[in-house]
Amino acid sequence: MTVKSTILYFTFALLISQLTGCGGGGGSEQNNNSNVSNNASNQNSTSVQNNADNNNSQGGDSNTDNSGDSSGDQGDADQGGSNQGGSDQDNGDQSDSTQSDETFSSKQQVSRFIQQATFGATPTQIVSLHEKSASDWLKAQMEQPASLVLPSVVAAAPDDPDDGFNLFHIEQTSLAFWRNSIAGEDQLRQRVAFALSELLVVSNAGGEVLTDIPEAVAAYQDILIQNAFGNYRHILELVTYSPAMGHYLTYMGSEKGNEQTGRMPDENYARELLQLFTLGIVALNKDGSVKLNSEGAPVELYNNTDITGLARVFTGLNLNEDDPEELINTRFTKPMQIFPESHSEKEKVFLGLTIPAGTGAKASITQALDHIFNHANLAPFVSKQLIQRLVTSNPSPEYTSRVVNAFESGSFELPDGSSVGSSGRGDLAATFAAILFDEEARTQAAENGGKIREPILRFTHWARAFNVENIEPKYIPQLWETGATADLGQHPYRSPSVFNYFRPGYKAPGSKSAELGLVAPELQITNASSIPGYINFMTYFVMGQQQEADVDELKEEFDEIGVEFDLQEALQSFRPNYDPLLEIADSPTELVAYLDLLLCAQQLSDQTKQNITTALSKIPSDEDDGFLPRVHLAILMVMSSPDYLVQK
């Protein structure tokens, strides 16, 4: 048996021995006791819930969220970050407040917080932030300049726009994402923007326009990145005028109705704006629970008449035509333009608001967004989903209420006594601070808490944890498309529909978590194919096979499109640094303890640690590589264990 096959054998053996009947899209149930609700003995966690429903689910499911199924069409399918290492700034010596911030009082607490707030903790962060001020770290992160996507896309565009298909240009939205998420100094901003992207979904997965014109999605990504700590109302405005969203949800070019021809305004954006981006479909209490009428049934917020009225608001928007000579790629980066002759002059009635007949497009959009933004459902609907993306899948009503208070007041007091937020409703700086510093996020949580780590976050965590060198994803073809279940099973900004990869209210069929009434959104993309796919994907990188790849074919592709190819950079790209692990690898116990803190914030159960330690002891020092095979196995077993896959 080769070293690689031995490592894979032990990794699969551990996973199979611990994996429970979590269910998932098409996966078979397995009978053991480690899942979302019970994956490690006496471990802490928090939870999240959600209410946007996905009608593009995998396998049978039970739907308990607040978004239902869409009855309309789903649409067609500064500089970038440094490429050297992760963001390790401690920013811990700036506090002038009198209150003590104990959030980072232990390395375990640092690791856990940073895993929730970024794309993964680094060894340097865990050491340097220990006993520093988490409040100062958060405020410093909010001041970090934004690492943007569009500049990279524009720089990669062919000199002659008529040159045709250019894969390197098209893939820049993905390459910039990987670079920024792993190496960006603005880690909190990047992580928050990714969370927002899973709520306000635009995808270039379907090919055609949003694939061929990457500037569109890049500009959309930058909206979320630049406004990650801004106001949700402002984001709704920018999203509404975004050509990427306009094309994706098919209201770009929507015209006023014509009774003679039977033409009606496109209703797609109106429906998803209410259902997925702002309110859901049933009334919510402040704590995120569903309001019931006198008969015990959920209270529906609107009907199709409301959608029809709101759809009139978004007529008359199309690509900017101020400069007829401007390239279409550039026009897709600018807000859509209003064409008054195409805008509906009719009265627009929805959700109790009447916009008088004859009101222009700009005023109609402003009034409509203001009315939706001030609706009582918006704060709990949005807040609960953002908790879910960062901390936990099933937050308590009290946790949700506290975050809703921060969203509505626009202010949050940090542990050091200082405040963040503009004191305006919808302030996201206050909202995300409330999510991360809440007592439920920071203290030992219920056994049923936690969230499944998304595949994207697992990979970025590995890259940051082991300080990969030369972060140039352009040299790693595997990162150009990771959405297949044979790979990660998820790719940034390429969800299969406007409902994201998974629904916030998803309950895995046949799972113990579902029996307990718990949602587990990420399990919707967990199945019999995705589990070995993830392990194989990580094995490639963990074992350094990217440094052994035959780059001749890749060089030919670069030469064909006229992109400079650096052989040494290609061979060194994403090379991990395992030196700290090799220094202690002669002791399996020390090795597991190191990885437990770095990757799991000391959440590995005693049984898991024992299983891994036993397996590692059977991997001797290699004549050529020393204990490197043992290090490889240790990382793979930890990152494949349910104790890691469930972020507590």
Question: What kind of feature is each model-predicted range?
Answer:
Residues 9-18:
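Bacterial N-terminal signal peptides
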Residues 106, 126, 130-133, 140-142, ...:
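Active-site substrate-binding loop specific to GH73 endo-beta-N-acetylglucosaminidase modules
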Residues 17-69, 88-101:
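Bacterial Sec-dependent N-terminal signal peptides
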